[in-house]
């Protein structure tokens, strides 16, 4: 008899997640705004009610992804800081130390798929709202959804690149060869 295959790390199986509740909430928030919008457009027909409920779900998704799911599932976090004296705004990125925290392949795969698929679905809904001119008023809600989901997507993509670059720099400059060379040079200079 053949034994059933055991699920492997990296498969799209939420049971393999290191943080299954965080993952399920992440997926729930990501899909609930889309489902509310679709259900509202097709069945409810009350624009104000659907707009408010979808906006609340989008806001909860934005907050949860930015502050909880990103940190727990892939060890990334971002925020925006404003210099009060100059008024300049810049994004700050934070990533967990790869030596102290392991990110499971399943969590990583779910996170990045959910992050990139959601804006693509909202873009499809925007095209649909434009094509069916009777639903053009719904485009305002889709535009807000696109702004929120694309902001998180861009920020986490930059945060991931920043985290990979700093990890590479730490490995390059933290190695024993580099420390021996710099230690030898500094030792000669200050004898």
Swiss-Prot record:
GO cellular component: Golgi membrane
Main location: Golgi
Coiled-coil annotated spans: none
Positions annotated with a glycan in the UniProt record: 83, 180
InterPro entries membership: TVP23-like
Source taxon at top rank: Eukaryota
Family, as annotated: Belongs to the TVP23 family.
Protein name (record): Golgi apparatus membrane protein tvp23
The species this protein was found in: Aspergillus clavatus (strain ATCC 1007 / CBS 513.65 / DSM 816 / NCTC 3887 / NRRL 1 / QM 1276 / 107)
